[in-house]
C-alpha cells in the first residue's frame, strides 16, 4: 500500500492484530497495537445519523447549496441537466463544465445505501473539480428494491460511458458510501465499462466506500437491498481483482463508524497484494456526512488528491 505525505492528513496502512495466545495473554501497550473487531448489531454498525451529533440535519442540509450551484452554472450556460444514459426513469446525469475546454472528466456517484437520494443533493460538490478545470458528471440510478445492486452497477457503467463520450481527456472517478462501492466496481476486473473507457481512468477515490457487501446481508436494510451470498461475491470489489493499472485512494473520516473505517482499509489491503496502486487516508475529525465537503473546494486535499496525476 502506497504511503503519501499529505499535509495534515496521514496516509496509513491498517494495523490489525488479534490475540492468538491463551486467555491471560495481554498486549504490551508500549510496542503492540491491537484492534479488536467484534460486531453484534450490523444494522447499528452502518447507522450514521444516530451516531453523529445533529445527524438528522442531513441530507436536507445539502439541498440548498446544491440548488444554488446548479442555478449559478445554468445562468452561465455551464450546466446540462438530466442527460439520458438509459431507458429507466432515473437513468439521467447532470454535467457541469468549467470555463474553457475541460482538462478531463470527473464522475461523482452518490451514496444512500443504493436505496435513497439522487444526483440533485450533491451538485455543489462539483465545484472543486470544475474550478480546477474539469467537467463533472453526476448520475442518478435506479434504487433498490426496484433494482438489484448488479443492475445498478451496469447502470453506472452506462452513465460513465455516455459522459466519457461527451468529454475528452482522462477520467477521475469518485463516489461516497454506496457510490464508493460503485466506482471501485468500475475498476475491478469485471467492470462493465468498455475497454476504451477503462483505459482513460487515471484515478479513483472511494470516500467511505462499502467494498465487501457480505456484512450487509445481516443488516435490516437488506430487506430492501436483497443482497444474497451469490450477489455479494460478484459485486464486492474486495472479492474481485482490480483491473490492470488500477490506482485507488480509499478515503474516510476518522470520526466515522468503525465499520466504515474497516471497510475503507479493507479494499486497499487486498488490492495492494493484487497489483493495484493504493492509498488509505483517514481525514481527522470528519464524520460520514461531512467527509465529502472537501470536494467543493479546489484547494482541499480531497480534491487535490482526486485530481493528482
What role is predicted for each listed range?
Residues 265, 272-309:
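C-terminal catalytic histidine-bearing segment of alpha/beta-hydrolase fold enzymes
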Residues 48-100:
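N-terminal cap/lid segment of alpha/beta-hydrolase-fold proteins
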Residues 99-128:
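Short, surface-exposed "cap/lid" segments of acyl-processing enzymes
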Residues 117-126, 137-172:
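Catalytic nucleophile-loop/oxyanion-hole region of alpha/beta-hydrolase
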Residues 158-220:
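Primarily recognizes the serine-hydrolase "nucleophile elbow" in alpha/beta-hydrolase
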Amino acid at each position: 500500500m502506497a504511503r503519501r505525505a499529505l499535509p495534515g492528513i496521514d496516509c496509513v496502512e491498517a494495523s490489525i492484530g488479534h490475540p492468538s495466545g491463551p486467555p491471560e495473554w495481554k498486549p504490551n501497550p508500549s510496542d503492540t497495537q491491537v484492534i479488536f473487531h467484534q460486531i453484534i448489531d450490523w444494522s447499528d454498525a452502518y447507522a450514521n445519523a444516530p451516531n453523529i451529533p445533529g445527524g438528522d440535519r442531513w441530507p436536507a442540509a445539502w439541498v440548498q447549496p446544491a440548488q444554488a450551484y446548479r442555478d449559478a452554472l445554468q445562468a452561465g450556460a455551464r450546466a446540462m441537466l438530466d442527460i439520458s444514459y438509459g431507458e429507466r426513469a432515473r437513468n439521467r446525469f447532470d454535467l457541469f463544465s468549467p470555463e474553457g475546454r475541460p482538462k478531463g472528466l470527473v464522475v461523482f456517484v452518490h451514496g444512500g445505501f443504493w436505496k435513497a437520494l439522487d444526483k440533485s443533493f450533491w451538485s455543489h460538490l462539483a465545484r472543486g473539480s470544475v474550478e480546477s478545470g474539469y467537467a463533472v458528471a453526476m448520475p442518478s440510478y435506479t434504487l433498490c428494491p426496484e433494482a438489484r445492486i448488479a443492475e445498478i452497477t451496469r447502470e453506472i457503467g452506462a452513465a460513465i460511458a455516455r459522459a466519457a463520450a461527451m468529454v475528452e481527456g482522462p477520467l477521475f472517478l469518485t463516489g461516497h458510501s454506496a457510490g464508493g462501492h460503485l466506482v471501485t466496481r468500475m475498476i475491478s476486473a469485471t467492470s462493465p465499462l468498455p475497454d476504451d473507457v477503462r483505459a482513460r481512468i487515471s484515478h479513483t477515490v472511494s470516500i467511505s466506500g462499502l467494498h465487501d457487501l457480505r456484512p450487509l446481508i445481516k443488516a435490516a436494510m437488506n430487506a430492501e437491498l436483497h443482497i444474497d451470498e451469490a450477489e455479494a461475491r460478484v459485486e464486492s470489489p474486495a472479492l474481485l481483482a482490480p483491473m490492470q493499472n488500477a490506482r485507488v485512494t480509499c478515503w474516510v473520516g476518522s470520526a466515522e463508524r468503525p465499520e466504515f473505517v474497516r471497510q475503507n482499509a479493507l479494499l486497499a489491503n487486498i488490492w495492494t497484494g493484487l497489483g493495484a496502486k493504493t492509498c488509505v487516508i483517514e481525514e481527522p475529525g470528519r464524520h460520514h456526512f461531512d467527509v465529502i465537503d472537501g470536494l467543493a473546494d479546489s484547494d482541499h486535499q480531497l480534491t487535490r488528491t482526486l485530481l493528482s496525476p
